[in-house]
């Protein structure tokens, strides 16, 4: 048994060194808790930071954009505008569809928002059109969030109407019930219906009108209560043949009598089973299909939701006929899993590299095993805390753990190195452990709390970016805290049991060679340091130059928001001339599909044409291009997009806009390109004046590409100019005119067929095959007050005009969105500045306001707060260090190392061609915490040497630098190698991880070289300043 000197207290580590069994069991408990926590943690791409978002869709077939705006959208907007917690309200009113997107404050629970939306819809019900086929429908989903899964349902033997009916009743409803699913949309528009196509000439010859037919159909098909008979002994429920279920029954319907002979519907119309809306279509690759897009609720876990869908699919497909095929075209979780797996691999690689560095420096297997236990234990223990905080395993938390690999090993290295030094001097292992751990305990606490202080400002970042990095910061802080605990408990205990003079002195050829190499390096460093200390002002000028250089680099480096990820899915919008019909657009879409599917990187394609909740007009089509896995294609998504756009440019009459889907979705509307800029006015006339002028200037800017606008005011309109006097004389009202037009051309839903499983519509329209275009208006007939039939042309003139294809609002005012991409040789910061400069040259009137939207707006907000964030991190660290050292001066000495890290990080980013984005900024903030460790280790030992050995400040700092050179170099290389796998990552999601690694590696290299020389010089300068200040105060006191 070793006899311990009385001074060998060991500080806070003594209890754990002396009780190895208790310490071991405590560490086993941390390990088990972490393993259990890891298995319980959900997996996602990023932390769940979605805004509470609700979409309200109202369909009114046949209504123009102007009617939809005034009769549907505006009443709803007025009610929604009164809700508390509403952050932004945007709407899009197009032909037959109104879509309102409500984005609420991050602090408002989605369920509370849902209740408010339902109450507002109820309040607006009486203000909406009485013939609205269906009330407004809301869904808890962000329309700009790409679907988590896309499925295509096809059949070679069944019509699409039957396929959609089965999908809607048997598949979509079941998927909608899965927890986390926000909305299941069916694209393809093939809902079954009975279509009644009136022969205008036939009903005119019989003296009938479309209104006569509509009234007859409506009255012949009803489904209402009839009562029951309650007799003395039996009760009988009343029923009747009041419903018609098939097209054949409708053909036989008598709509009128002439000369005693019945006129049946089949005599004046073509009645057939068909689709409810014939102007909708969807395709999977080149095959017509029903496409199911599954979107998640904001905040729902994407992995567990997708897994639940996958588990249910076999059961659902078994309920369908064998000729019906269900294909999963895209699953976002495939890339998310691959990205998380790559990050996990990089984490393991970082651990292996760090352990290798430890062996290289310590040259001793027992000494290497000790931190080899400490590093994984600290990281695994973090998972237990993550579970209690409702975190997930995602790219950011795994990045935090990967970076933490270099952090957490520092503490263990510092402890082992200090204990080993005493063992090599001849101390017994137990005594050395107690003495070394006690001596280094304060340093470990200083390192830990000063590093955590750097992370505190991240917790106070505002808006969605702050929420995004909350998990990153807390995960890293927890890992650092656990590391400190392990380093003060397990590490010294293992050193006392595993290290000995024999094991440390035992050398092989490698250890002897490396020892000589390190001795030569330390000797060279000592000579260089002596020269530097003899020329302090030159060194100080270098330090000041790095500060100036860091500011200049900060100003000139290209700035961005969030790295553009390659998730293997591309969203696209196909734009054709504004007067394009559905048939024309469908043909163009097929031409484009042929071109896209020839690209070797494309795996599948879904496309949609028609007006619904996601597509505003007939002249546009939505595309989703699913790429092959990254390891099966040669190019990343940006090169694929450029290649596809070049190929599609050869298709005449269409423009294709493409953008890669991203894990982080801040936008609330589906835009054509990545970034948005809005013009908002009090009237549409103001927009029609200024939007074209601004577009012309923006399209000339080299900083922008793919500039487009959703302002489309050249849609063809047949304006029916009714002579009201003539109409009134004949007893014809404007309501009669509107009804006649709606009956003929609005695909009017006039009746409902009820079944046990679903409801189907009866659609009324004119058969216009023989009278295309404006000539069809000549066939319209109206009934006068005396029962006569009056041609529409006798009381109205038809004028062709232009009008908007859709009317968009932002917070109830007209708005247009200009979308743009950023070319490869420019940054988002360049594009934003160019737009702002262009706007100033236009001198826009006061009634027009401009604003960036989505990720561009978030970029502006993040850029504005970045400098304050870094300042806050520095101030927080100064306060913590000042408290720990009870000094105003020493924290400044420690913080003087920071400019060198900034210069290294910014230079590395510029050399690598990376932007200074949010991820890179987080790396710079972490560097603030890392590089000051070098100064802390030097200053701690210098102060101890001055205090305990009576050394002069110069001798003390010189000895401290030589004494701590090896652990400083070791810890810096460990942190560098912890970040290296992130810098070199090439797999799925590498774009997200690489800026963090580049910035940290560059900052660590430059700071390591410079701070070894600048820190001791600044330490001595501040020491002289302190002495001078004290002497001045002393002189003043003597004179007083």
From Swiss-Prot:
Expression triggers: The mdtABC operon is transcriptionally activated by BaeR.
Spans through the membrane: 16-36, 347-367, 369-389, 396-416, 440-460, 472-492, 537-557, 863-883, 888-908, 911-931, 968-988, 998-1018
A GO molecular-function annotation: xenobiotic transmembrane transporter activity
Subcellular location: Cell inner membrane
Keyword Protease: no
Main subcellular location of this protein, as a coarse class: membrane
Bilayer topology annotation: Multi-pass membrane protein
SUPFAM superfamilies in UniProt: Multidrug efflux transporter AcrB pore domain, PN1, PN2, PC1 and PC2 subdomains, Multidrug efflux transporter AcrB TolC docking domain, DN and DC subdomains, Multidrug efflux transporter AcrB transmembrane domain
Coiled coil residues, start to end: none
GO cellular component, as recorded: plasma membrane
Domain of life of the native organism: Bacteria
Family: Belongs to the resistance-nodulation-cell division (RND) (TC 2.A.6) family. MdtB subfamily.
Stored HAMAP family: MdtB
Function: The MdtABC tripartite complex confers resistance against novobiocin and deoxycholate.
Subunit structure: Part of a tripartite efflux system composed of MdtA, MdtB and MdtC. MdtB forms a heteromultimer with MdtC.
Protein name from the UniProt record: Multidrug resistance protein MdtB
Organism, scientific name: Escherichia coli O8 (strain IAI1)
Lineage: Bacteria, Pseudomonadati, Pseudomonadota, Gammaproteobacteria, Enterobacterales
